[in-house]
A protein has these predicted regions:
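Gram-negative outer-membrane beta-barrel proteins
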Residues: 64-70, 103, 114-118, 140-144, ...
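Beta-barrel outer-membrane channel/assembly domains of diderm bacteria
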Residues: 24-128, 172-179, 186-188, 264, ...
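Bacterial Sec-dependent N-terminal signal peptides
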Residues: 1-28
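Outer-membrane beta-barrel pore domains
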Residues: 27-31, 35, 234-401
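Hydrophobic, lipid-facing positions within transmembrane beta-strands of outer-membrane proteins
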Residues: 41-43, 54, 89-93, 118-120, ...
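Transmembrane beta-strand segments that form the barrel wall of outer-membrane beta-barrel proteins
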Residues: 99-118, 134, 188-196, 292-299, ...
Length: 401
């Protein structure tokens, strides 16, 4: 693992040096004319003709949590010894830009703490209505997962994310926006992926993952993938999205670590599980108010044991800058709340999981420098109608530079 990290570090160092050298040594460009700026993507080097650009950004996330940091997954998690933690939760290095043409773009994201290459992709974005992406990235399926953990409204994602996310996959995606600024303004994403999780260059059988997402920009304005209305939208901006995915593999769930299995699934035989899932999603921002909601359904067919299981879940999340109506409230302060409900098996009505969350965000410099304090309450009930509850408190400082 140490050697692997060393190779990755060397690769990134060579990549950074090489990109700057290419920009500086291009025959048609004098190195003295290279533009150096500090943007919302970190430091950026670019040529006057905009055909070459290179930006680099570092991101750190410090977190204090008690009695535990992670959301409980099973009833046994409620009985674990309390472990108050203070840690660097995330440390990322982001590199991106364009080469040869402004519309030929690239992006890399490296997890410094874990030594993992999270994202690597090339994008052809010459036309707004049709774009192509190849490589590895967070699958465009659910809003909560696509939004960067550094641009979320709460400290982290809800309990809904774990069972329903498609996370990072490798493959190809076709996407674009059609009929912009009209009542028929739509954004679409169609993906063909390996379906085996992060870093998996091949699938476990001959079945690929297929994902589709159709988003209606209902007011003729596209809503960015960020939490909180820090830009203070003067005009109402909202979306209604539908997404679906199908995959056959030896996994029933995915995470940043790759493929894995939900509780109750223990074997990993190639092609054992067929997973079909879908969601309906809404989001809205207007004058300091923000809203987002997802409703999920997922069906897992186990071909080895001849069983079927259906999972459902949803969350609602909203926030507001109360300084817009109350003079004594500081402008950088936002208050947000979340409720999530998850049913691991729709055939077992007694079993459910609930999460309540309340967050206070203080924005020093939008999402690039913010402090969040959050209190959460979990209430889980099992098949025997036995209930277990727990409170959690977290403080997090998010900074990018």
């Amino acid at each position: 693992l140490t050697i692997k990290r060393l190779y990755i570090h060397l690769f990134l160092a060579c990549f950074i040096i090489g990109n700057i050298a290419v920009i500086a040594q291009n025959d048609s460009i004098n190195s003295k004319k290279i533009n150096i700026d500090y943007t919302n993507k970190g430091f950026q080097f670019s040529t006057p003709d905009k055909n070459y650009s290179f930006h680099i950004e570092s991101r750190l996330q410090f977190r204090f949590a008690t009695p535990n940091d992670q959301s409980p997954v099973t009833f046994n998690d409620f009985y674990l010894e309390s472990k108050t933690s203070f840690k660097i939760n995330r440390a990322r290095l982001k590199i991106g830009g364009n080469a040869y043409k402004p519309w030929l773009k690239y992006y890399f994201e490296y997890d410094i703490a874990q030594g993992n290459l999270l994202d690597f992709r090339i994008m052809i974005e010459k036309w707004d209505f049709f774009k192509v992406k190849v490589g590895q990235w967070k699958t465009y399926y659910s809003r909560e997962r696509v939004i960067s953990s550094g641009k979320q409204q709460m400290v982290d994602r809800s309990i809904i994310n774990r069972p329903f996310t498609l996370d990072r996959q490798q493959g190809i995606e076709f996407y674009g926006r059609v009929f912009p600024k009209t009542l028929a303004d739509f954004t679409y994403h169609i993906s063909v992926l390996t379906g085996a999780g992060r870093s998996a260059t091949t699938n476990d059988d001959n079945h690929l993952m297929y994902v589709g997402r159709l988003q209606w920009n209902m007011f003729g304005r596209e809503l960015e993938m960020t939490g909180s209305d820090i830009k203070y939208h003067d005009k109402p901006t909202g979306i209604l999205a539908f997404a679906a995915a199908t995959n056959r593999s030896n996994y029933t769930r995915f995470s940043s670590a790759g493929g894995g299995n939900l509780l109750g699934y223990v074997t990993n035989i190639p092609g054992q599980y067929r997973v079909n899932q879908a969601l309906i999603e809404t989001a809205f921002k207007y004058r300091g108010f923000s809203w987002q909601n997802e409703n999920h359904i997922k069906k897992i067919t186990d071909y080895e044991n001849n069983t079927n299981r259906t999972l459902t879940g949803y969350y609602v999340q909203a926030g507001y800058f109360f300084s817009n109506i109350l003079d004594f409230v500081p402008k950088p302060l936002e208050i947000a709340g979340l409720y999530a409900n998850y049913k691991p098996d729709t055939d077992i009505n007694e079993a459910y999981e609930q999460e309540f969350g309340l967050a206070f965000n203080w924005f020093f410099k939008e999402h690039r420098n913010k402090l969040t304090a959050e209190v959460s309450h979990f209430s889980y009930q099992n098949i025997d109608s036995f209930t277990q509850k727990e409170w959690r408190f977290r403080i997090q400082w998010e900074i990018s530079f």
